[in-house]
Amino acid sequence: TQVDAGDYQITLANGQFLVADIVLSAVGLQPNLELAKATDIHCSRGILTNVLLETNQADIYAIGDCAEVNGLLLPYVMPIMQQARALAKTLNGQNTQVHYPAMPVAVKTPAAPLTVLPAPIDVDVTWETEQLEDGMIAKAMDNQNNVRGFVLLGATAAKQRLSLTKLVPDLIPTAV
């Protein structure tokens, strides 16, 4: 609820009230876009933003699982951390574009460790696979033989994570 110009009253689940000049909500894996659509914020699979995390509405930003930044909807911890760092600087007067390096997602299970770095949806790739005694390595190669993504299964393959990640280009490069 808006209280005064720029102030919001927030009611917590336990009934406690807080007053804030800004509200940030980033919860859930599947974006609920109802509120955004009801306020004419542009949406696709998520809330559409530019690299400054700005929506089409003045002074409204989106981060987290709901933010679709330059067509990328990445509901993982690392992209959210990148967004939070950039938006914090922007809200403090230093416009900062979000930077997305190659960010593999690891599923940490002792029996079958799995790491996945999806290839960009707009890049044609062919998969090269290598069977290992305890798993496999699959690399998504573009038409110029560059690694654009990978899947690593098993402890032996997991050791390749850092070296393969360094070969994959940034999803959103650092602003110059």
Residue ranges and their predicted role:
Residues 176:
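Extracellular ligand-binding/catalytic regions of CAZymes and related secreted enzymes
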Residues 1-6:
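A conserved short coil-to-beta-strand element within the FAD-binding core of flavoproteins
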Residues 7-11, 16-89:
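FAD-site-proximal beta/loop scaffold in flavoenzymes
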Residues 66-158:
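Mid-to-C-terminal Rossmann-like scaffold of FAD/NAD(P)H-dependent oxidoreductases
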Residues 20-21, 124, 160-162:
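Short acidic, gly/pro-rich beta-turn/loop elements at beta-sheet edges
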Residues 26-27, 153, 167:
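Residue-level recognition of phosphate/Mg2+-coordinating polar/acidic sites
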